[in-house]
């Protein structure tokens, strides 16, 4: 029998969560996936994901990435430089981040692993069950697609306070599908 990679839970109280979103502009959906699919998705991310690195050091700098599929000469020195730059920006109180990432949409569009599990994940995120859930929760009936990026926070990684408002790019709503195990602590 095939493993479930992405299956929504039957226990989501859509009406209550939609009311909360309407009141606050944000909502947390606990246990949005079935336990089996959450375990399988967590395993995919932990064992079959070639993580790159995304960084930003202050508002004036561009986001820099080290892609897992696009290694470049000098990446080791670049890594040291961007670690120092993100440290300095964070110390100054500027917007900064440093985390591991896998650009699911870019990987899909560029054919990194045609038909592989990350492609299938993106298809599930954009399939009717998930899109209908997001439309119902947000009241945004015109939503047609979702972007996707996997993000991993390892020791030394961080994300500064920020806004996910990307209206100029056509975004209507941002989402986070948190795959962290229960023992996680914010520090």
Annotate the PLM regions:
Residues 1-187:
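Fe(II)/2-oxoglutarate oxygenase catalytic core
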């Amino acid at each position: 029998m095939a493993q479930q990679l992405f299956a929504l839970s039957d226990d989501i109280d859509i009406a209550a969560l939609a009311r909360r979103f309407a009141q606050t502009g944000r909502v947390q959906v606990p246990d949005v996936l079935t336990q089996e699919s959450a375990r399988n998705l967590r395993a995919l991310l932990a064992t079959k994901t070639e993580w790159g690195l995304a960084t930003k050091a202050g508002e004036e700098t561009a986001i820099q990435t080290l892609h897992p599929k696009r290694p470049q000469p000098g990446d080791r020195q670049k890594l040291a430089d961007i670690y120092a730059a993100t440290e300095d920006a964070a110390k100054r109180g500027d917007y900064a981040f440093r985390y591991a990432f896998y650009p699911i949409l870019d990987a899909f569009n560029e054919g990194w692993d045609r038909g592989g599990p990350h492609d299938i994940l993106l298809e599930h995120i954009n399939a009717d069950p998930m899109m209908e859930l997001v439309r119902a929760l947000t009241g945004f009936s015109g939503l047609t697609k979702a972007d996707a990026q996997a993000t991993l926070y390892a020791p030394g990684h961080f994300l500064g306070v920020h806004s996910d408002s990307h209206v100029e790019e056509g975004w209507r709503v941002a989402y986070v599908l948190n795959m962290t195990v229960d023992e996680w602590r914010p520090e």
